[in-house]
């Protein structure tokens, strides 16, 4: 096994002997460059924080105004009726409710403008609700309050919170440090050499490159006055930095790197998932152990030998365009750079945004459902205003009986079915046995004659004291005595009518 490794080891030694100090000439840091460019692009092109739909926002705004209108309807009506240039003037304090005084006057004026756009039937409904204290008004008020409360609980999602975006603030902190450093200040004035800014395992870990990602990118990609035309990230940089003087060179180098990062990807929004993936891969690269010394804390390309690693920008043994975040004295214990901590904090904020988004969507659905309920309640309030005055119930028309007076027919031959009459006796051919066929009563000149006939029939039945004697068609045994069956039928009908009336009252 050792004999197979020897040629490789010798070739590395020969390479180290024969290579002059120069900047890297291939895209050895393309991977690290791409990962950090995700952070650079996020500064200006981070995926927008999503918010509620326009329909839900309008419902929330309208609910607050309707609640104000209901509580101050008379005043809102006056404002709505006034000319725009004439409203609102507080001529008398007793005319203006507290909810519309001083700084609140503008809100009431806006509510009045909304009131103007409401349909006439809805205005009638609001007037009805404003004057009633019943369950309908109470339920309507509760529904309006639920809408405004749901929006208030998710103020950022409904666009009512205008504070800066925490995730974006932390992305800027990752790029420029805290306090923020731009221009030549990206590389601190105390970093008079590239090794001081970018790190050396035998001396100190990176200073500027550990504080801000912009400096880390310059260490990975930039040229300097000793190592010009660096190709470690992209084809030859044109801004070479004199770390001892700087003089605008750091700012020029950063501008060039920033432009290269954005080239070809300017239109694409950076997502939380992309930032999270980039942060995870950068952390893995930093903690990866390399070479026989198991050097950790190295970001970027360097030719690792048995000795130190110096990120001085040259392409030579033990050197490279890199960032070192550990030292041999600390046994290569990695110190996580400030910019990576800030990036991970930004990702945590974006994850919190997603939680707020999920909860906000639920609130939005609830608000739209509550709006449907409020619309239904308003429609119920419209109904009483549409009802015409109740008219007195007309007395039922008394049907005229087209039949002939059957009672006048005392002979069976004159009692004809064609006249609506029926002979009730099966034995007699003469007598008072001609009756209306359909059972309806008839008017007669005597009037009292019918009553007399009924009384007679009832008396005939009551004379029968035994059940076996109570066999006449007009008689019926009720358990104790023989009674006229028509009287029993009338009592049964009266009882059923009374029962139906009671059931109707219950429901």
Swiss-Prot record:
Q: Which residues are glycosylated?
A: 141, 371
Biased-composition ranges, Basic and acidic residues, are 83-95, 396-420, 456-474
Q: How does it sit in the membrane?
A: Lipid-anchor; GPI-anchor
| Predominant place of localization | membrane
Quote the residue positions with lipidation, kind GPI-anchor amidated aspartate.
484
Q: Which UniProt keywords apply?
A: Cell membrane, Glycoprotein, GPI-anchor, Lipoprotein, Membrane, Signal, Trypanosomiasis
Q: Where is the composition biased (Low complexity)?
A: 384-395, 444-455
Cellular localization per UniProt? Cell membrane
Tell me if Lipid metabolism is a UniProt keyword of this record: no
InterPro entries hit by this protein: Trypano_VSG_B_N_dom, Variant_surf_glycoprt_trypan_C
GO cellular component terms, alphabetically, are: plasma membrane; side of membrane
Tell me where the signal peptide lies. 1-21
Q: Which residues get removed as pro-piece?
A: 485-507
Q: Where is this region: Disordered?
A: 83-102, 384-474
Q: What does this protein do?
A: VSG forms a coat on the surface of the parasite. The trypanosome evades the immune response of the host by expressing a series of antigenically distinct VSGs from an estimated 1000 VSG genes.
Q: What is this protein called?
A: Variant surface glycoprotein ILTAT 1.25
């Amino acid at each position: 096994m050792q004999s197979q490794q020897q040629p490789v080891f010798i070739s590395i030694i020969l390479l180290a002997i024969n290579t002059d100090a120069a900047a890297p000439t291939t895209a050895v840091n393309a991977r690290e460059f791409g990962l950090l460019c995700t952070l650079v692009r996020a500064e200006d092109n981070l995926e927008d924080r999503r918010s509620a739909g326009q329909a839900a926002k309008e419902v929330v705004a309208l609910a607050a105004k309707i609640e104000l209108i209901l509580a101050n309807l008379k005043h809102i009506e006056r404002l709505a009726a006034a000319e725009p240039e004439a409203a609102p003037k507080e001529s008398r304090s007793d005319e203006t409710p507290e909810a519309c005084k001083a700084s609140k006057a503008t809100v009431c004026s806006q509510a009045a403008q909304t009131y103007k756009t409401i349909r006439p039937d809805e205005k009638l409904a609001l007037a009805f609700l404003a004057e009633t204290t019943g369950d309908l008004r109470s339920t309507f008020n509760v529904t309006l309050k639920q809408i405004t409360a749901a929006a208030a609980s998710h103020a950022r999602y409904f666009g009512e919170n205008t504070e800066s975006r925490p995730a974006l603030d932390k992305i800027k902190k990752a790029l420029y440090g805290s306090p923020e450093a731009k221009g030549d200040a990206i590389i601190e004035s105390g970093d008079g050499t590239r090794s001081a800014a970018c790190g050396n395992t035998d001396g100190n870990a990176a200073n500027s490159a550990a504080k801000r990602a912009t400096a880390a990118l310059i260490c990975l990609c930039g040229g300097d006055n000793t190592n010009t035309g660096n190709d470690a990230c992209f084809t030859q940089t044109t801004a070479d930095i004199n770390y001892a003087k700087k003089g605008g060179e750091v700012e020029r180098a950063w501008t060039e790197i920033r432009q290269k990062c954005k080239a070809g990807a300017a239109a694409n929004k950076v997502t939380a998932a992309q930032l999270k993936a980039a942060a995870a891969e950068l952390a893995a690269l930093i903690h990866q152990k390399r070479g026989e010394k198991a050097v950790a804390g190295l970001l970027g390309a360097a030719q690792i030998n048995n000795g130190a690693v110096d990120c001085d920008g040259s392409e030579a043994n033990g050197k490279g365009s890199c960032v070192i975040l550990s030292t041999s004295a600390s046994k290569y214990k990695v110190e996580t750079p400030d910019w990576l901590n800030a990036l991970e904090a930004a990702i945590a904020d974006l994850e919190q945004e997603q939680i707020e988004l999920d909860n906000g969507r639920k609130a939005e659905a609830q608000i739209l459902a509550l709006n449907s309920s409020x619309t239904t309640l308003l429609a119920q309030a419209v109904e009483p205003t549409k009802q015409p005055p109740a008219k007195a119930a007309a007395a039922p028309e008394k049907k005229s009986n087209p039949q002939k007076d059957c009672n006048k027919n005392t002979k069976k031959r004159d009692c004809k079915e064609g006249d609506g009459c029926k002979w009730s006796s099966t034995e007699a051919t003469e007598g008072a046995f001609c009756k209306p066929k359909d059972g309806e009563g008839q008017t007669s000149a005597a009037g009292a004659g019918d009553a007399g006939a009924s009384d007679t029939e009832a008396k005939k039945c009551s004379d029968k004291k035994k059940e076996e004697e109570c066999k006449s068609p007009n008689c019926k045994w009720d358990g104790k005595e023989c009674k006229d069956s028509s009287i029993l039928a009338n009592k049964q009908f009266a009882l059923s009518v009374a029962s139906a009336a009671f059931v109707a009252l219950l429901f």
